[in-house]
């Protein structure tokens, strides 16, 4: 939304009606049009609505859940920042969650190549263990998700673990990038984030 605002590009964002008012307001503040989807349709409903709107109107669809450029940019930027921060010291663990899968896959590529001893730990909600379940994601011919993953249940942190395994994340699974998948209680995760912000900056 910030890039579109800076470049003057019109932007339409789909959001489930269960998303926070603050998130909607921020997107609108940045000039985006927000289209709400029924909360019962989960993330897959937002995805399908965005895809249909783009197709019906001739708009560009970013397809961030399938677009390889998502992981590529994190491999060439985010990973470089992390490695630069640990240039003169060991990097024992990298712990992350996932949304589209771009950050975790892109950074994991670089860590596997340049810091092979670093343990990569992926967290997901304790009540939405998509990776931990070992169950595959059903996909359409274009690699888009064919419905919600059977292990997903609603959880408290928006943007963390959608109700399907993104194609971008599938690369990390297939390449065995992850040393461990750790389920985390969302409420405990938020409490720890507040603790870290207050005590570590």
Region spans (language model):
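Short Gly/Thr/Asp-enriched flexible loops that form oxyanion-binding sites at enzyme active sites
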Residues: 1-7, 104-114, 118, 123
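Active-site-proximal loop->helix
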Residues: 1-53, 130-145, 166-172
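Short glycine/serine/threonine/alanine-rich loop segments
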Residues: 9, 32, 59, 116-118
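Generic beta-sheet signal
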Residues: 14, 37, 64, 121-123
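Conserved hydrophobic/aromatic pocket- or pore-lining residues that grip, position, or stack substrates
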Residues: 27, 82, 120
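Active-site/ligand-binding loops adjacent to catalytic centers
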Residues: 47-48, 57, 113-200
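Active-site/ligand-binding-proximal alpha/beta "capping" segment
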Residues: 57-102, 106-110, 171-175, 179, ...
């Amino acid at each position: 939304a910030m890039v579109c605002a800076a470049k003057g590009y019109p932007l339409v964002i789909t959001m489930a009606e269960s998303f926070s008012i603050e998130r909607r307001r921020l997107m609108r503040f940045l000039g985006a049009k927000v289209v709400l989807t029924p909360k019962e349709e989960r993330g897959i409903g937002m995805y399908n609505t965005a895809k249909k709107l783009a197709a019906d109107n001739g708009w560009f669809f970013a397809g961030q859940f399938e677009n390889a450029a998502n992981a590529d940019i994190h491999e060439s930027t985010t990973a470089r920042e992390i490695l630069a921060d640990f240039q003169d010291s060991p990097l024992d663990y990298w712990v992350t969650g996932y949304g589209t899968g771009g950050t975790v896959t892109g950074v994991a590529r670089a860590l596997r190549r340049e810091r092979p001893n670093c343990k990569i730990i992926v967290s997901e909600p304790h009540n939405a263990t998509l990776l931990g379940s070992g169950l595959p994601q059903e996909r359409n011919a274009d690699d888009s998700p064919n419905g919600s993953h059977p292990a997903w249940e609603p959880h408290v942190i928006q943007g963390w673990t959608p109700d399907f395994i993104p194609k971008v994340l599938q690369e990390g699974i297939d390449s065995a990038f992850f040393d461990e998948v750790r389920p985390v209680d969302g409420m405990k995760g938020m409490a720890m984030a507040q603790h870290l912000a207050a005590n570590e900056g």
